[in-house]
């Protein structure tokens, strides 16, 4: 075994050659297995456990024979027989025939008696524990589990767990019968049964991919005397890849389904029913092989188990009914078909037929979908082989691309070809995402292109109309509110508009002029344009100036009362300046109220009359005794401080009239 392991590891080419031979020899195993499978099925049905133990042994032998290519038919014929179990143990070992005679003798009974009884029980107990339903249908399920459990478990589990396989290798090498019989069924079914789902999924796919050529694969084959299958596995990385796929996709999700479903299969008619489904599911070409191998080499499948358990699982994934197929040994046998030659063919076939699988499976969709799901589940980097299992290594490559590069571009392009069903789904979903975004982008360019034309050239004529509307008071209001902006607009338009509306523009500014006292700064702003215009059109200035003169006179008349007051105020101011010799601007520092308790008196000379409660405007603080004030009527005169009271409420209002000097009078007044 040690020699075989390195040999299998060393050359994948040898495995490939073995595969080719295997393919040629498969028809023979398929023919031979066809006959024995029936009795074996009967046995499996009746004595699922013993048969299982024997089948694993027999199956490995046919597969080994197929792999070895030298005695594929003889071994197939042997497989149906009971001696094949010894051959199985022997085959994995170095000298299949001699060891078959030697080991088979000792181990076969243990395997048959032990495996069916103990391993199957263990498996049943383990499986029943893990899968109570399996326990319910112990024997139908047991056979499946021994086949799938022992062979698949060992094969797949040893494959996933290289360490497990290595222990098996020593055991198998030393005691092929025992390890396959009890260690396989007892140890592996228990430990590795679910580990198969767990380990096979994560490890087996990857380890299988790498390990099929590696020793772990050999242990697997050793467990199920398949040195040649190992070469096949090494030579057929595709097989190993599919197996990982099966172990990952099928075993993890489907192994249990298988366990649950196999009950139905085993109890209902696991072997026959499962075989037909296998024939249906496995590619049609594999079907004959599956049919033959299923029964005679149901466990050769085990030897191929890396593929077989996974194919079984794969089938389970591909179809829930296939789970029944898995439940039936036929599944395992069909798997061997895939393993022995179908793997080679099936892998290529799976490129094409795998599509069949995937397509029927698409109907079941479980297979494809589970795989896409696995793809979605990056935890299944190993499942990448699953893609290979479906579509062969090329598909596996596509699977890697599709899984790892979940990116639609890579996976969608390569995978859809390999996977008509699963990849199409995944790719289809991805493409759906793509189109959604590009459409959004595509509309945008048109929008931008449309956006550029929207420049509004017709606006220039519009402003002319606006000016016509602004000619009335509205224009003046606009200028007052936005003098700077309006002024700029008018300045820009002056060359065109001035001939038509030069007077209006100046009139607008003239309207502002009356506010020179209150708002000198705006006046300056408004006058600036008029100055510029005057420079441009000096001849018009005289007429405009003439208009300005009457306008101030015209505006006051609008308010005759105000006009009279203004005139009185101006007259009083002139008299005040002459009388008090007051020079400079008249500024109101604050307002004060005459004390209501003060004595009233008439004014005379330079003094104002005192009226209780009257409010006076303080223009100057002449001395500590008197202040120069102005009454509401506009008369000026001195008022004694004693008669004045500060207006607390008016203090803030005073700020409006005179901010700078407001502070001084109060302290002085006080």
Curated annotation (Swiss-Prot):
Induction and repression of expression: Down-regulated by the PML-RARA oncogene, a fusion protein expressed in a vast majority of acute promyelocytic leukemia. Up-regulated by retinoic acid or arsenic trioxide in cells expressing PML-RARA.
Keyword Phosphoprotein: yes
One Gene Ontology biological process: regulation of neutrophil degranulation
Segments of skewed composition (Acidic residues): 504-514
Post-translational modification Phosphoserine, affected residues: 340
Region 4 X 12 AA repeats of K-P-P-[PQ]-P-[EQ]-[VAF]-T-D-L-P-K, residue ranges: 70-165
InterPro entries xrefs: FYB1/2-like, hSH3, SH3-like_dom_sf, SH3_domain
Sequence repeats: 70-81, 82-93, 94-105, 106-117
Top-rank lineage group of the source organism: Eukaryota
PROSITE patterns attached to this UniProt entry: SH3
One Gene Ontology term, aspect cellular component: plasma membrane
Tissues expressed in: Expressed in peripheral blood leukocytes and bone marrow. Expressed in monocytes, and to a lesser extent in granulocytes and lymphocytes. Not expressed in non hematopoietic tissues except in lung.
Disordered as annotated region, ranges: 1-561
Gene3D superfamilies given in the database record: SH3 Domains
UniProt modification remark: May be phosphorylated on tyrosines.
Keywords: Lipid-binding, Phosphoprotein, Repeat, SH3 domain
Compositional bias segments (type: Pro residues): 454-463
Gene Ontology MF terms in the entry: lipid binding; protein kinase binding
Subunit structure: Interacts with SKAP2, LCP2 and DBNL. May interact with LYN. Interacts with NEK6.
Protein name as catalogued: PML-RARA-regulated adapter molecule 1
Gene behind the chain: PRAM1
